């Protein structure tokens, strides 16, 4: 019997913070748990439209991810990105304390797995996909984050779903802080 219960409302809250019109996202699933029969899949549309598919995939051992930036609904490559929603930093190797003393603290903080964090700053509407990597690299340097997280089509873990990469207990990825810009 499966006792995991992904939290769609939590996922929805996160997506609504990223975009006032959360009707159009690109979701990605990847097999995580050993023995999972799930395969990588890309889904375009709303969380409501794909909730059942994402829940089933998560319960079957897949990690659930979302392309943070707005795409054209045709793919998940840099050329598919149409609008920057947020800048973010992956703090899997360091703590989050420096975030809270920053000149501009993040709008959203997510615990992706125990003691590992993602921080998001909502982007100005005029931010172009071409300048995205420069800001990402500066954030990674400033906060000792992962410098490889700099492509505009990057997917990040979707809060409300379970992280199952390690063969231990599943961990629900949770938004620990969220506020509008």
Identify the function of each model-found stretch:
Residues 1-86, 96:
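DNA replication initiation on ssDNA origins
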């Amino acid at each position: 019997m499966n006792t995991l219960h992904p939290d769609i409302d939590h996922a929805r809250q996160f997506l609504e913070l990223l975009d006032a019109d959360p009707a159009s996202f690109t979701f990605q699933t990847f097999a995580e748990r050993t023995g999972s029969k799930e395969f990588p899949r890309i889904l375009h549309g709303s969380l409501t439209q794909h909730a059942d598919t994402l829940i089933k995939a998560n319960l079957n051992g897949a990690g659930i991810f979302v392309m943070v930036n707005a795409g054209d609904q045709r793919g998940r490559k840099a050329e598919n990105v149409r609008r920057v929603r947020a800048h973010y930093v992956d703090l899997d190797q360091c703590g989050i304390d420096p975030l809270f003393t920053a000149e501009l603290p993040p709008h959203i903080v997510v615990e992706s797995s125990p003691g590992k964090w993602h921080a998001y700053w909502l982007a100005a509407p005029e931010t172009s996909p071409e300048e995205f990597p420069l800001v990402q690299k500066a954030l990674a340097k400033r906060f000792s984050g992962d410098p490889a997280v700099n492509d505009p089509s990057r997917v990040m873990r979707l809060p409300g779903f379970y992280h199952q990469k390690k063969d231990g207990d599943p961990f629900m990825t949770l938004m620990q802080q969220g506020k509008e810009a």
